[in-house]
């Protein structure tokens, strides 16, 4: 159930991101989207340290983009659209209602899972802690690790290109 709510929030953030016009609000939406993605990754991998590292890397990239945007954009006023806020709230509530109506056994499964988790929490905690670090380099998640390495390399190249001393947007003004 938690995974479903987080995925719905990711979907709604994607819709909201397409409606944003101000670069700083786009950066904020991208940061929230990254946080939700890290939550989903942490829940699936059962080890949040990988999600924490991923979030810190994206945060570093976002800080570089923030410096770039603030040096280029003028002092535009940032206003929140009431219509966009209501649209996202209605979309989220409507999607949750549709999920509950279409899947009548979802609530029953949720209650059964909560009861089962109470009993198996201690046994699984010991076994999962041993295997959770091994999962990072095995098949399903090794692709995420390779993607992270490529992202870091691309971010390094972009950072070097942006921060050239006399040619980039961060050059000193005369």
From Swiss-Prot:
Localisation per UniProt entry: Mitochondrion membrane
Record keyword Membrane present: yes
Keywords: Electron transport, Membrane, Mitochondrion, NAD, Respiratory chain, Translocase, Transmembrane, Transmembrane helix, Transport, Ubiquinone
Membrane association type: Multi-pass membrane protein
Molecular-function annotations in GO: NADH dehydrogenase (ubiquinone) activity
Matches recorded under InterPro entries: ComplexI_Subunit6
Main location: mitochondrion
Protein name as catalogued: NADH-ubiquinone oxidoreductase chain 6
Naturally occurring in which organism (per UniProt): Anopheles gambiae (African malaria mosquito)
